[in-house]
Design a protein with these regions (language model features):
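N-terminal helical cap/lid subdomain that shapes the substrate entry/recognition surface
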Residues: 1-60, 66-71, 81
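Generic C-terminal helix-cap and adjacent flexible tail
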Residues: 28, 175-186
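Substrate-recognition "cap/lid" segment bordering the active-site pocket of phosphatases
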Residues: 49-53, 79-132, 136-145, 159-163
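Nucleotide-sugar donor-binding loop of glycosyltransferases
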Residues: 153
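Structural signature of beta-strand start/N-cap positions in the alpha/beta core
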Residues: 68-71, 128, 148, 168
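Short acidic-hydrophobic, aromatic-tinged amphipathic segments that line or gate anion-handling sites
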Residues: 169-173
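Alpha-helix N-cap/helix-start and coil->helix boundary motif
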Residues: 12, 16, 59, 79-81, ...
C-alpha cells in the first residue's frame, strides 16, 4: 500500500500508468496492469464521483466563458467513458465542443493529439487556444500542442511543479483564468 499523498503523483498519465506506478516493482507486468484494469473499470464506473466535485469557482468560470462565446473542450487522461460521465454529471449546462478521454490507439497526454483533435474539429489556430491544467503533464501537453498554457495551482500537484514547467500563467483561483484571458467576471 501507499500513502494517500503518493497517489497525487501516480495519477495524470492514464489508468494503466497509475496501476504500473502503484504496483511493487517486481509485479509491474503488462498482465498485472491489465488484470487490475479489468477489475478497476467496473468499480470506477459506479464510484467515479465518490468524494469528487468540481473545484471552487470552476462552474462560474465555465458559465462566464460560455456566455462570452468562448469554445470549451476537454482533453483528459481518464478513460473516455469516465471522462464523458463526469463532465455530463458536473457540468450539464455547459456546451463543450468536444470531450475527449483516453482512448485505445490514441497516445495519452502529454502527447498533444487530443488537444489537436479538438482544435481541428472547431477550426481554431494555436494562437487562439489556452490549455488549462493542474499538473506537469498538462503543462507539457499544452506546450506540445503549441498553445498558451495556464496552470491551476489548486489541483493535485503543488504550484512549484507547475512553475518548473513555465506555463504562460498560473491561476491561484478559478477567477484568475478569466482575468488572464481578459474576460470580465459576471
Amino acid at each position: 500500500t501507499h500513502d494517500t499523498d503518493a497517489y497525487r503523483y501516480f495519477v495524470g498519465n492514464g489508468i494503466n500508468k497509475l496501476f504500473e506506478r502503484a504496483l511493487p516493482e517486481t509485479e509491474r507486468t503488462e498482465a498485472n496492469v491489465l488484470k487490475i484494469r479489468s477489475q478497476f473499470i467496473p468499480y470506477y464506473n459506479i464510484h467515479n464521483a465518490d468524494l469528487s466535485r468540481p473545484y471552487p469557482g470552476i462552474e462560474q468560470v465555465l458559465h462566464t466563458l460560455q456566455a462570452n462565446q468562448i469554445l470549451i473542450g476537454v482533453a483528459s487522461n481518464k478513460y473516455q467513458a469516465a471522462t464523458s460521465k463526469l463532465i455530463a454529471q458536473y457540468f450539464p449546462d455547459i456546451q463543450f465542443v468536444e470531450v475527449l478521454g483516453q482512448r485505445e490507439g490514441v497516445p495519452a497526454k502529454p502527447d498533444p493529439q487530443a488537444v489537436l483533435e479538438i482544435m481541428e474539429k472547431v477550426d481554431v489556430s494555436r494562437e487562439d487556444v489556452a490549455y488549462i491544467g493542474d499538473s506537469c503533464v498538462d503543462m507539457e501537453t499544452g506546450k506540445n500542442a503549441g498553445v498558451t498554457t495556464i496552470g491551476a495551482s489548486w489541483g493535485f500537484r503543488p504550484r512549484t511543479e507547475l512553475e518548473a514547467y513555465t506555463p504562460d500563467f498560473i491561476a491561484d483561483e478559478a477567477c484568475d483564468i478569466l482575468r488572464f484571458l481578459g474576460i470580465p467576471e459576471e
